[in-house]
A protein has these predicted regions:
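Membrane-spanning alpha-helical segments of multipass transporters and channels
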Residues: 3-206
Length: 206
């Protein structure tokens, strides 16, 4: 019985006893969604980060507001026409940016990706959403909107669960995580890298 095992252990040699003390329990591991390396695990965070920074640079380089002279030339302009006027161009550039980043992840960095097509789709969707956010902030508030975008960037880098589990961050960031776009974009990309779990991918994009 158990007594025999204990006596056998006590009577064993030093090496057997040290092995038991160092590892009294042997775990049987079964990895459900394995990730090949640290770079692949961090790819969603840095991909989403680069898309956001690209949107900030886009807003800084391109003019979003019409000049007063141009407004006089175009009579009877409505507010929604002014708003939508250059958004399409912003979105097209954002699609090119995000597509380039995601293709670089897949073919240059060669990250692990179980669903490359969905990964690219997540990148495009993220690019469009970030471009619309940046465009709206800029056309509504001007340079103040760009500053808001930078502040949001800092908050999301610290509080979106990109580098550490969100549960390990201060309570403020835990409360903010559900409101941050980074959280959902990274969630969708992680699904593509490690493997899909139910409808988590589509929920993250939705």
């Amino acid at each position: 019985g158990e007594g025999e095992k204990i006596r056998g252990l006590l009577g064993a040699g030093t090496s057997e006893l040290s092995e038991f003390v160092s590892a009294p329990v042997v775990l049987d591991k079964k990895v459900m969604f394995p990730v090949a390396n640290y770079g692949s695990a961090m790819a969603p965070f840095y991909t989403v980060l680069s898309i956001w920074v690209g949107a900030i640079v886009l807003a800084a380089m391109l003019k979003v507001n019409l000049t007063e002279e141009r407004k006089r030339e175009l009579e009877d302009l409505r507010d929604y026409q002014v708003y939508l006027g250059r958004m399409v161009f912003f979105i097209v550039i954002a699609l090119l940016q995000s597509g380039l980043v995601c293709l670089g992840d897949l073919f240059f960095l060669e990250i692990q990706c179980e669903h490359p097509g969905l990964f690219l789709l997540a990148g495009w969707f993220t690019g469009v959403v970030f471009a619309v956010i940046m465009y709206t902030l800029t056309i509504s508030f001007g340079d103040v909107g760009k500053a808001i975008a930078v502040i949001l960037l800092v908050i999301q880098v610290a509080g979106s669960g990109g580098t550490f589990p969100i549960e390990m961050t201060p309570q403020f960031f835990q409360n903010m995580a559900g409101l941050m776009p980074f959280t959902y974009s990274m969630g969708a990309m992680r699904e593509c890298i490690g493997g899909l779990y139910g409808s988590t991918y589509w929920i993250s994009l939705g």
